[in-house]
């Protein structure tokens, strides 16, 4: 049903072992890799087999409602932290869900403890925090989203726990992404621009959890643009790629200037695994040009 309607994600409940994900992949056929799998960790067996589940999945959800019933409630914070840390080390997306602003089902303001809980998830550098009953049956669904956004934005102003500094099995592309983030932070770049078809390079850059730099990902495909929206710190756009990579870059710059993300003279780092019709991994540093200069000049990588 879902695959016929071109869903972007499938969330599988009560995943207890990697074989559960493998069975789902067998049903998905050629959609494997295009449609992303979110494994929901909801009981003790899932926690015990966490590492093999993470390796087999695209994303993990810490489903705290059922998980808090299946394990000792006092163990829940440590289990959440373990899941988040292991996902960061393997470069997998992680979502913290359920009971974030539970009191707002009935009340117009969250409790102080709920605010701290959401902030702690942001400090752990999760990719997403997800509301459940607050927006499905609650009296104040819009206020819940507004509070969640305000708490997250404020919490993002201080550095997180940086679990991603200990990436496991980082291949060449991941090392390239690490280098791009280090370069961006070193030169105090205003942003990292990623040119990618399938979103893989944007995933890898997001895995590095840059603190002071947003990631602007440009793809020419609709589904990767949608799936990249789950990645922490990534702002995805869909554009037509030109056979001239310089024109593609200038289109990206123009969009970001129009949206007031960049100004003329801002320094940016560009990382790409796609140039023209060939796959080329590269990193560049650029200063955002004026429209007049952009239309006349072709820039060489620095």
Where are the regions that the model predicts?
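Non-catalytic helical/linker scaffolds that mediate oligomerization, partner binding
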Residues: 1-302
